[in-house]
């Protein structure tokens, strides 16, 4: 499996194609450098550099790419395990349609969820600068001779799923990209952006807020939320420390969907999330709880990926309840 990361390796940060890459799990500081790698056995991966990774993505038989931004307190092995399940479900639903590409940002390895939460929140914000460089590198590659833009350009569609605090990484990435690299707003880069159990304030996608850039960069933005998500309930309580009392987007959906751009949609998962992930009801976008069968949230996402529309039969519909 290919992946991109801004976690420090135990080796030097100097990139070199073909070298061994081993995560330094005791260092959760985001690196300014970004590493383009391929997974290996026993935690020993291989750095292949950006040109080789983009070449492999371009030459893949899959028609679409699905970037995966994981949540807080997820170490690389867990991220790869979930990404592999995501790839398996995509292949079962429609072979050669989707290639899953995880983006691994640094989560803490300390004991104690509260301490981890604050360390990871800082890492999420700082990771935005690193992954903004990834987007800029992709734009450079897309227009370079390596992509043969005038002969056989890469036409794969790009989708993104961000879970929990991964949505904070997404928001900060687009903000940093817009501030430092772009002249007049972000380009329409993503076909679908799926924000699952998003650990950001529920006004994030409102017009005028920082997260509005997510809707500018996406054809569709789909928010999956559940009011009984225990992990986000704890998150809201933890954020009171910083005097942030607003509810989380993954708890309620947008505070007022009429104040969000028209390409933002919301999906109420309250009836299924705890049966898929007991007892917290937070990790509900993969299986139906048995680890083997696709759940309704995954099926809904995959239908959006294939069709490119959230509600193809009713262009005015913006909400649905999964049961």
Model-derived segments and spans:
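Active-site micro-motifs of SAM-dependent methyltransferase domains
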Residues: 74, 167, 200
